[in-house]
Amino acid sequence: MLRILSVHCERGEPKLAQFIHRMKPVFISVFCLWFSLAANAELTLKEIRTASKDVLVAYFQSNVIISNEVNTAELAAWRLNGQPVKAISKFVTEADACDHHIYLQVPVLVNGTSYTLRTPHGERTFVFNEERTFCESIKSNQSGYSALSRVRYANFAIWLGDGGSRQISGDLPSYKVIKQADGKTIARGKLQSIGEDASSGDFVYRIDLSAVPEGGPYKIAVQGYGCSHPFGVGAEFSRRLGFVSFRSLYHQRCGCPIAEPYAWNIKTNPCHTTVWQVNGPIGEARLIVTGNEPTFTAFGGYHDAGDADRRTYHMDVPVTLMTTYEAFPQMFTDDQFNIPDKFDENYHIVGKGNGIPDILDEAMWGTMFWEYMQETNGQVHWGTETKGYSPFTTYEKDSTRFGTEVLDPRSASFASGMFMHMARLIKPYNAARSQELQKHAEAAFAAAGGDVRLTHKLYFAVEKYLLTGDEAAHQLVKDLSTNASGYANTYNGAPESFAGNGWLASYFFSYIVARDRPTDPLVVDRFKAAIRAAAEKEIEYLAGNAYPVGTPPNLRWWGSNTAQGQYAYPCLLQWSLTREQKYIDAASQLMDYVQGLNPLGKCYMTGLGFNRVHNPHDRESAYTKRQGWGPRPGILVFGPGGTGRGVSIPAVGGLARERKYIDNLGSIQWSEFTVYQSLCFPSAVYPVLGQGGKYDDAHDPFSMPQK
């Protein structure tokens, strides 16, 4: 490669020649590393699993990514109790670093029988035990089903990699749910056929878990096939899920230390606090900061994704948190999620326990950055950006300069309602802070002027009326209220739309639950109808797929197949208003999807589950992985759908949409995330499904003896 590049440089490209000269040692190091890895490749047979009653899975892990590293060319080299297997297929995919699932067609397995499997890479003797041998075909929530829901289930689907999907032959098997600690049977049943599912490509069967009581951990044992990963219901299992998900926002904070005793010691000082006044055009990674521009200091807000820009789209985070608090105030308290809330003037951590619910503290963190972004005339910058991207390390070591983007009326428009909302909710705790935020809101609304979005105009009017009692604002609410019906058409759209004409329930929900101001019953009914319409629409989408993905086939944006929090939100709000069981059932089912109840049996949220994401496209996770800690917890990656690159057998391009995924760091359509698309709604929904409460992260419910 060096020779080819050198020839290319000789053809009149001196800059490239200089680049190659500088990078030559790096290229040599890369080649040496590759050859070293190849020479020290370690392929390990980690586990014998099943996929069916007559299909064993030899599950290998490797520290190198070579698709054909496991030798499957010679059928005779694979023998079970001395007899060659009947057929071989495989699923190879990137993980840590590569997983090889080798599917072996064998005689029907007999429970309690000892077998010896010989492979080209060694042999293993094992006993097939349907209560202990893991069956890949059982797909369940690996973290915690909500005890609030009366509809809980796992799916069963046989998929053999490049051998494709398979139906169950003969009678459908029975199953039982057992307690992991003592093997006691908790529930029984028989698989029910759901049918062929186009979204996953699977033949799907249902395992009803509705009779399983709160507690765990449990396992599902399917007669003749094997067992599931452990799972729990409610209690500490659900609280743990809510805790990890909510704290993803703390981990994503900009300008805030992320350190013990609140998290791993990722950075002990605030990051990206100096902002250069560039006022450059909106665009990802294209803003040039010379370092000669005027500067100011800013705190608050969030890193966008695997990189560190801050954008107007992020306003949906505090907005959603505030609405969730209003819908479920009894579920949120101070010191609930172990996040710092006391700081010195330079935002070094002083402690926690300020008497304000953590969910409002987090909403304030997301809000206050935009105060710094507001000019004295009320206009608000779109955000901060830079040229290129920060290095893959802790942001404490990031010397990248970030500058302001242009003043944009959409930013002022969105911020006006957000500021007013925060002013109202913080008033009981800090009246002076409330007054400051109200001034920011009024200035932003005036600056947006005729460019204010209708969605944001209603939001501002609702919050202003509820805060101040202003009758002109109330009249504006009445005049605009019919427009809220648009929520059912935009609630599941790409979240960028919420900075424009897309509707969030937050823009009008406060009026429904208002207690301190008179409200117009007709307007309340209109707003309630908008919530119900969106919830009913989502329930229809949920019923349209065998897995609870919750999307129609034609819905596609980055992360749309793991955005169940966004889809569940109208159902959750409808349940808060009516307590009708079907709505919390729907919300709960949707939120099971990313925890493992999906075709790949993958938990798409880092730090949770048994089949985990290893390679999120996240700069600080690169640092935490080098420390041996794993990725930062709570990151919900974009997941399946779309296109990308990476090693996979079979090739993902030919698979159904819910199987198009490779855990490849460079494939950002699969492995990246954003704070506003991926983390916002789950951080609000999972704590509600866990019924609030405080989780002690020193005690993992999966590792503790259960009564």
Go through the PLM ranges and name each one.
Residues 338, 345-359:
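Acidic, glycine-anchored loop motifs typical of Ca2+
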Residues 105-113, 210-216:
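Surface-exposed, short loops/turns at beta-strand junctions within beta-sandwich domains
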Residues 122-125, 149, 225-234:
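Short Trp-Ser/Thr-centered turn/loop motifs at beta-strand boundaries
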Residues 1-23:
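N-terminal secretory signal peptides that target proteins for export/translocation
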